[in-house]
Amino acid sequence: MTQRAKDWWARGGIPTICWHTGADFFSGYPECRESELDWASAFVDGTEANRRLLDGLDHAVPELKRLPSDGVPALWRPFHEMDGGWFWWGRGGAANFVRLWRLMHDRYTHVHGLRNLIWVLGFSDATEDLRPWY
């Protein structure tokens, strides 16, 4: 993924990176539609679900850290179409999604120092009032 992003940047483009992952953060597209996160305990510090969530979010960090060394920015578009309800990150509702997004942004920016990411929130057309998802 990062080599393709670097190649695109070298040709004058700005790479976009999406992340289709299951709620375990290690599986792929089919699992993002079928798996679930334990929302009740995922944001409770010290729980097993919280540890799994933090480890899962960090799973993409080593790959993303390969970009800044070459001065490559990226349009980072995780958890898109969250308002549609067909992916695990949207089925937990708007409040949980916002907590997830903010946690990821905080970890990536402040804990891991990823400052080359341009954060993109990608809605579907399934919801008219998108304000709760911000």
Q: Which stretches of residues belong to each language-model region?
A:
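Extended hydrophobic secondary-structure segments that form protein cores and membrane-embedded regions
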Residues: R77, W119-F123
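Substrate-binding cleft/loops of secretory-pathway carbohydrate-active enzymes
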Residues: F123-Y134
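Substrate-binding cleft of extracellular glycoside hydrolase catalytic domains
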Residues: T2-H110, L114
